[in-house]
Amino acid sequence: MAVTYVFAGIPVADRDAAVGWYERLVGRPPDLIPNDDEAAWRLTETGWIYVIADAARAGSALNTLLVDDLDAFLAGLAERKVMAGPVKTIGDGVRVTVVTDPDGNRLQVGQPPA
């Protein structure tokens, strides 16, 4: 069995408010709105994040994205008024930061060493 797609779910209390925030995070509107409770962004050919209205579990997500240029990613966030935590270096030189959405869901963003 081969995994061909990954959809990383992010439970939120208010889908419409979350869509606005994630539009700023990603820099564009959702690629897919399958129903009134979900909205999804395609980040890679086979990797997606999606928000889903689920107030009982809102704030419980922890996902990780790896980018090729963390500094450029952070500059884009700053332009779109999205706050990120401090950048730390972990392991064998992976630089990471954490972005937390209004519900408390955490998105760790890292750049592996060159």
Residue ranges with predicted function:
Residues M1, I10, E79-A114:
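Vicinal oxygen chelate
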Residues M1-V19, A61-N63, P113-A114:
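N-terminal beta-strand motif that seeds the catalytic metal site of vicinal oxygen chelate
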Residues A2-T4, A55-S60, I90-G91:
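Short glycine-enriched loop/turn motifs at secondary-structure junctions
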Residues A18-E23, L77, G104:
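Conserved active-site tyrosine of GNAT-family acetyltransferases
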Residues W21, G59, D71-G76:
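Short amphipathic alpha-helices within nucleic acid-binding modules
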Residues V26-I33, M83-V87:
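Short secondary-structure junctions
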Residues R28-A61, R106-Q111:
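Conserved short beta-strand elements that form part of the metal-binding/catalytic scaffold
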Residues A40, W48, T64, A84, ...:
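Short hydrophobic/aromatic beta-strand element in the GNAT-like acyltransferase core
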